[in-house]
């Protein structure tokens, strides 16, 4: 049970956090990367994931997330440029929600893709 733990700046590379209770844990700045790091099914609701390294592998799928984190992920997705028309359409359809990002004032509002 890692609830309320301050793991900010921690190097969790390779840690198996699958099914971990991380409720209200501070993960800001933590390194969650590494091919052996298993975050599947982790409860990420209420987490501060600003400045973390999140692996884009199957080991970080199926998280339980809250609206704040979902919006943060959408903001990052919508910030990228992709020439594919279907991706641009998806990004544009999600912009209103993505621009609710808690750091939009600092990072800037995302404009529609053309």
PLM regions with names:
Residues 1-75:
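Tandem repeat scaffolds
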Residues 48-114:
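N-terminal capping/linker segments that flank leucine-rich repeat
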């Amino acid at each position: 049970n890692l609830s309320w733990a301050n793991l900010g700046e921690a190097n969790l590379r390779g840690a198996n956090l699958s099914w971990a209770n991380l409720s209200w844990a501070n993960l800001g700045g933590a390194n969650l990367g590494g091919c052996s790091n298993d975050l599947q099914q982790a409860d990420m609701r209420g987490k501060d994931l600003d400045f973390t390294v999140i692996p884009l592998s199957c080991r970080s799928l199926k998280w339980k997330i809250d609206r704040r984190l979902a919006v943060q992920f959408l903001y990052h997705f919508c910030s990228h440029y992709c020439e594919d028309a279907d991706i641009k359409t998806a990004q544009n359809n999600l912009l209103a929600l993505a621009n609710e990002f808690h750091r939009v004032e600092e990072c800037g509002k995302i404009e529609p893709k053309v």
